[in-house]
């Protein structure tokens, strides 16, 4: 364990703020981290052969990734490291006291170390499995290195937002990926077979051409998206009140509201 602690001390990371960070600075760092993440999703990795990743669209939204770019790995290494370490600690295979400062610090450090490992492991898996194909065989190592570096940058961005920004970087990246996908599918004016790809432009196109069947097909996804959004907002506001009673104060009780979801 001493060897692990020695490794954790030399791990690179984002420095903790020494004082409370003002809200405007937290907002600035959150926006900066999100902007860098979105830009990474627009930078293709060098040496990869062109391919179509439509079958992997669901994975992209779940992992907050953009396959074929520096953001190919997304939050995958962070989530994988967290799940494995929580299972090991929760099952008692690794006996760390997470109630102590030392135990929590060791947990966070080892989680980061595992995330570094999974950046290279998942990058190699993407390339060696054929999901990302290099243009030439000798470019495979270069492709793996680029994907791993992209995953490490996302790891630091998550740490930056968690310490200096607002909320969690992982949640923000997932929300950004889902929001971007919804926005593009709703409002894209890119034409496919002389027809807009986005549902809203397609609806306008159908109404102007008098094609009611096409208008109905475009309207259903729009209404479904709005309905799901309203249901999520409503469900997020549902609270369950738990009655509490105190043995030391007979006759005194209160209700404790908890979020249902």
Segments and roles (model prediction):
Residues 1-260:
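Core subunits and conserved enzymes of cellular information-processing
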């Amino acid at each position: 364990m001493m060897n692990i602690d020695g490794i954790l001390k030399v791990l690179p990371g984002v420095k903790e703020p020494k004082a409370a960070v003002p809200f405007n600075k937290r907002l600035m760092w959150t926006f900066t981290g999100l902007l860098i993440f979105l830009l990474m999703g627009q930078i293709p990795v060098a040496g990869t052969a062109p391919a179509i990743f439509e079958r992997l669209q669901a994975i992209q939204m779940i992992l907050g990734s953009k396959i074929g770019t520096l953001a190919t790995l997304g939050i995958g290494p962070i989530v994988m490291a967290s799940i494995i370490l929580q299972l090991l600690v929760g099952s008692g295979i690794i006996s760390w006291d997470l109630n102590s400062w030392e135990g929590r610090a060791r947990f966070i450090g080892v989680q980061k170390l595992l995330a570094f490992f999974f950046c290279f492991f998942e990058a190699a898996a993407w390339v060696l499995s054929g999901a990302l194909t290099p243009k030439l065989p000798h470019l495979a190592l270069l492709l793996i290195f680029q994907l791993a570096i992209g995953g490490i940058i996302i790891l630091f961005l998550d740490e930056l937002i968690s310490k200096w920004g607002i909320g969690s970087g992982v949640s923000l990246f997932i929300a950004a990926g889902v929001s971007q996908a919804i926005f593009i599918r709703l409002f894209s004016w890119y034409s496919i077979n002389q027809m807009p790809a986005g549902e809203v432009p397609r609806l306008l196109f159908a109404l102007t051409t008098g094609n009611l069947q096409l208008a109905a097909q475009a309207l259903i996804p729009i209404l479904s998206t709005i309905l799901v959004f309203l249901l999520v907002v409503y469900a997020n506001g549902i609270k369950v009140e738990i009655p509490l009673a105190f043995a030391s104060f007979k006759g005194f009780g209160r209700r404790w509201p908890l979020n249902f979801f």
